[in-house]
């Protein structure tokens, strides 16, 4: 009986040792596989950056979409993801990612940030969320190059136009006209003609609005 018990204990010990050995082997294999996957994902992230820099936004998006599901991407890569969605005309996802990323990029280069604000503003604009687009265009104007200002003023003109804010629409179309003339002379003849027509059409509305405002003030004064 004692010998049988001893043999049973010995057999159990050998089984436990074997199980432990197999577990360690599996754990080591899993760790090695995990390490390999992380290295592969890091290489994929590098490829995404290369695609983004070369303006291959579709390819960049395919990589970042997958990585975004597995990791917590840093704000810059979140911004890259948002911009890639913008260029794929997926404006809702562009807004989702850029809105999260931009506030965390305050220490980045001004022009880089202006580009993200532009993509966010354009996404809101294309979704017809004009009121939300306005502050984004204004933030872009604080950071962008002078030659880029005309586009923002032009879009702001339409944002205010669609909101029937005639005076601000006129002011921004006028600013766009001046910016095109000063920083991009002769580049956008069709756009300049359109802006000229918009200003003419708005002149009457702005004048009528001013007259109504004066009339209201005079009535209050009496």
Residue ranges of predicted features:
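Alpha-helical segment of the N-proximal tetratricopeptide repeat
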Residues: 42-66
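TPR/TPR-like (Sel1-like) alpha-helical repeat modules
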Residues: 161, 166-184
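Terminal, low-structured helical/coil segments at or just beyond the last alpha-helical repeat
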Residues: 179-222
